[in-house]
Each structure stands twice: as structure tokens, then as C-alpha cells.
Design a protein with these regions (language model features):
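Long, aromatic- and glycine/proline-rich binding clefts that accommodate carbohydrate-like moieties
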Residues: 65, 139, 314-315, 364-414, ...
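A structural signal for short loop-to-beta-strand junctions that line the ligand-binding cleft
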Residues: 86, 95-97, 127-165, 197, ...
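Hinge/lid segment of periplasmic solute-binding proteins
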Residues: 103-155, 212, 312-315, 381
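Conserved C-terminal helix/tail region of periplasmic/extracytoplasmic solute-binding proteins
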Residues: 166, 172, 191, 254, ...
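Extracytoplasmic/periplasmic substrate-recognition and gating elements
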Residues: 168, 254-259, 299-367
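Glycine-centered hinge/linker elements that transmit conformational signals in sensory
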Residues: 184-187, 231-267, 312, 316-319
């Protein structure tokens, strides 16, 4: 059930925004502006944030006569968006007042001075009590201050086509206990329905965080190893789990169980997965996120009324079935305030409006997000809106989060390099892992790493 975009807070008549001085004339720096600049990602099938921001612009301007919200949708896949946003933030003339910020970049961007702390606002915001504590922590900087207000979170699992599984003689519901079960199912699909692509796992440099987090880390955290020792604050090298995770990628791509490397390295492969391969029955399994059904809703870019009848979900198993038996990865996005915002009160009021109870719920439903507000997650309309919400919320107990460090982005990039070298057959998993280890030591230094061997 769609909820209307209605403000639950009486917005103050915000004072006029002040333009950053960027011209040679000294008087220009003091010219008042009535515009709030809001930057966010818009790419392919991912239109939900764009729709939400358009609705929030209309609501904010209706309640704040004389103020204008300038929307700056940035076209680009996740890494491209981050690069373009960073370029905007480097100049006062282009830096946004409000920005759509990935939780894993909050620390690095706040350390870089791009973001403004929000604690003085959250302390007086009654809605803040409705946000789960672990969601709040996702918006913290390395200094312990709040820089981002969470919009929603997510988990990841295996989406599978029940009709194709039945056609291949595989049991439905699918309940893999080990990696081998997943690969065996893919091999069966290949043998029984050769025209169907068995399995997609995002991999390679072009996919950025979708590859490193959604592909590789979904595997690694199903082993006994991890990327980072949070207690000792050291990045791990020399782990068997790292090599084995690359081995899974090798099995998929060198074993013809997934897309060709050329297909997988296309920046638009995510749009193909959601808009064509899954709806058209060309792909049997995809390791993907809880949000993807939003593409198939009536409000999405590729409506597919039968999606819930056709698609099933299975938790990603641990490597050999060891406890807890399954694994997942969680992330999420926030709304953050630019450190250079000249009217921070107005920027905050936009954030508070966009993420109040009704508007957060409307966005979470449209974008198939796991709610981070208790009053949304407990709402009957939210619970009834998507038949997968229960499954994806249940696997939160198995989930893991990316290391919350300012240098994670560089490590993530090194992971995608290792994945690409293996998927294209240029290196063995052992060789690629060794190169990764050397790269991490080069980035962090010997003192910031530890070998498990």
C-alpha cells in the first residue's frame, strides 16, 4: 500500500541560504540564496531515490515559501557516483547541501571534511528515538559524531527462479547448505537447460562495491576468515578463506556457470540482471540484494506482476555448512549534510522531512528496503507491502558489515582487481590473493596488517 508523502514536522520558515563566494566581486559572497542543493544517485533501474527526492522537493517547497530545492541527480553506477560526488565536494561552488551517502563512505568523507556533524539536530529530534541503534551507528564518523541519517538497510541472499529449478529437476524450495550445493545446482541447470545462465555473482572492477561486497564478501564471511580484525584494527592477509572465495569466483566464471567475463564486466550488467535476465527466465540464480524486487513493482522500471510467483529466495550458505549455517552482508545509505552548507538549519529540515515516519515508510516500500525505524518496521502497511520483507529481515541475524574504516574504499578496489584477474583466467586464486596481500600492505603499511598464517 502506497503511503502519501506528508510531513510529520512543522518546518520552520528557513532563513535564506547564503551563496558561497566564488566570484571575483567581494559583494557576491554575501548575496543571499534561497536554494538548497540536493545530490543523489540515479542509474538504470534504480529510480526510487529520484522519485523520493522529487516528492520531497514538492513537499518542502510547499511548506517553505520562497525556498527552492535544486535536485542534482547524478547518473552513474555506484563507483562513478562516488567519484562525481567527491568532485562536487571539492569546490564550494558545486558542493551539495544535502547528499545521498553510502554508509561505508561516511567515515572517509567526514574525515575529508565533506560532511557536517548532525548531533546538535538529532538531540532535539524526537524521531531519532525511533531509529534502531545499529542503524544509527552506520552514520557515525571516526570521531563518534553522527554524519548520516539512515534511509534503510538491506541484506543479500540467493534469488532463484522456481520454474527453472523445477524444469531442471531441482528441489523447490531451494535450501543449500554449502557452497558445493550452490555450484552443483548451477551445474545441473547448465546440463538440463543449456540455454539458461545458471548463476550470477557480481565480479570485477567495473562492478565496484557490488563485486567486492555483494560478491566476494558474501563468500569470505561464510568462511572462518574475515577482511579485518576490528579489535586489533588490522587488515588480514594470507587467509585460506580469501583464496577459497576467489576459487568460487573461478568456478563460476571459468566453469561457464555464469555470465561470460565480457558480460560481467559491463557496467550495466546489474540492469540486465534485473530488467531482462531474471524476468525473461534467462538466469536461474542471482546472489543479490533484498531491494531488487522494487524494480519489478508497478512503480519500478521493469514491472513484473508475476515476480513473486516465479522467484524464490534462499540464504547464502557458509562454505562447508559450519555454524551459523548462513551468511549475508548488509549496507545502506544515508542522507548527509555538506560541511559547506550555508543554511544548515534548512538543510536539516529537508533531511528531517525526507526521513520522517511517513516518508521513510513510503521510500522503504518503494525501494524494498529493510526499515531502520521501529515505527515503520512494526507498521502493518509496511509488513504487508512486500512478501519478501519477512525473509530478508530474518537473515539480519546472520549478516555482516563492511569494515567501518576510512581506508576501506581502497581495500575494496583491491578486491575487485583480484576478482577480475581470476574470473578472466589471468591468475589463479592463490596468485591473485598474493597480489592482494602485497597491495594491502602497500596501502596500509606493515603495522596495519596481520597475517593469519
Amino acid at each position: 500500500m502506497k503511503k502519501s508523502y506528508v510531513s510529520a514536522v512543522a518546518l520552520t520558515a528557513a532563513a535564506a541560504l547564503v551563496l558561497s563566494g566564488c566570484s571575483a566581486g567581494g559583494d557576491e559572497a554575501s548575496v543571499e540564496s534561497t536554494t538548497i542543493k540536493v545530490a543523489y544517485q540515479k542509474f538504470g533501474a534504480f529510480i526510487q531515490v529520484d522519485n523520493h527526492m522529487k516528492a520531497m522537493k514538492e513537499a518542502f517547497e510547499a511548506e517553505n515559501e520562497g525556498l527552492t530545492v535544486e535536485l542534482v541527480p547524478i547518473e552513474g553506477q555506484e563507483n562513478d557516483y562516488a567519484t562525481k560526488l567527491a568532485l562536487m565536494n571539492q569546490s564550494p561552488a558545486t558542493a551539495p547541501d544535502v547528499m545521498y551517502e553510502d554508509t561505508f563512505r561516511v567515515q572517509s568523507d567526514s574525515d575529508a571534511g565533506y560532511l557536517a556533524p548532525l548531533d546538535e539536530y538529532t538531540e532535539g529530534w524526537s524521531d531519532w528515538d525511533s531509529f534502531y541503534d545499529n542503524a544509527k551507528s552506520a552514520g557515525l564518523g571516526s570521531d563518534g559524531l553522527t554524519y548520516g541519517i539512515p534511509m534503510g538497510t538491506d541484506t543479500r541472499a540467493i534469488w532463484y527462479n522456481k520454474d527453472l529449478f523445477a524444469q531442471a529437476g531441482l528441489e523447490v524450495p531451494f535450501d543449500p547448505q554449502t557452497w558445493e550445493d550452490v555450484l552443483d545446482a548451477a551445474a545441473t541447470i547448465k546440463a538440463e537447460i543449456p540455454d539458461v545462465m545458471p548463476l550470477n555473482v557480481y565480479s570485477g572492477k567495473a562492478q565496484g562495491e557490488a563485486a567486492s561486497m555483494q560478491g566476494f564478501e558474501m563468500l569470505l564471511y561464510g568462511t572462518s576468515d574475515s577482511l579485518y580484525d576490528a579489535d586489533d584494527q588490522k587488515w588480514m592477509t594470507g587467509s585460506d578463506g580469501f583464496v577459497d572465495s576467489l576459487g568460487f569466483i573461478e568456478d563460476v566464471y571459468q566453469g561457464d556457470l555464469g555470465p561470460t567475463p565480457e558480460q560481467a564486466l559491463d557496467k550495466n550488467v546489474g540492469n540486465l540482471v534485473l530488467g531482462e535476465w531474471l524476468p525473461q527466465g534467462e538466469l536461474a540464480m542471482a546472489v543479490d540484494g533484498s531491494w531488487i524486487s522494487g524494480t519489478w513493482l508497478e512503480t519500478g522500471t521493469a514491472p513484473w506482476p508475476e515476480w513473486n510467483d516465479v522467484m524464490g529466495q534462499a540464504a547464502m550458505p557458509t562454505q562447508t555448512g559450519d555454524a551459523p549455517g548462513a551468511t549475508s552482508m548488509s549496507g545502506g545509505w544515508t542522507l548527509a549534510m555538506g560541511s559547506g552548507a550555508q543554511n544548515k538549519d534548512a538543510a536539516w529540515e529537508f533531511i528531517a522531512l525526507a526521513l520522517n515516519k511517513d516518508n521513510a515508510q513510503s521510500y522503504d516500500i518503494a525501494a524494498s528496503q529493510i526499515a531502520v525505524r521501529s515505527d515503520v518496521s512494526e507498521d502493518a502497511d509496511y509488513q504487508a507491502a512486500n512478501p519478501t520483507f519477512g525473509f530478508f529481515s530474518e537473515i539480519v541475524k546472520f549478516t555482516h558489515f563492511r569494515p567501518a574504516t576510512s581506508d576501506y574504499a581502497q581495500i575494496s578496489s583491491a578486491i575487485t582487481v583480484a576478482m577480475e584477474s581470476v574470473m578472466t583466467g589471468q591468475q589463479s586464486p592463490e596468485e591473485a590473493a598474493a597480489v592482494y596481500d602485497d597491495t594491502v600492505i602497500g596501502i596500509i603499511g606493515e603495522d596495519g596488517t596481520a597475517s593469519v598464517k
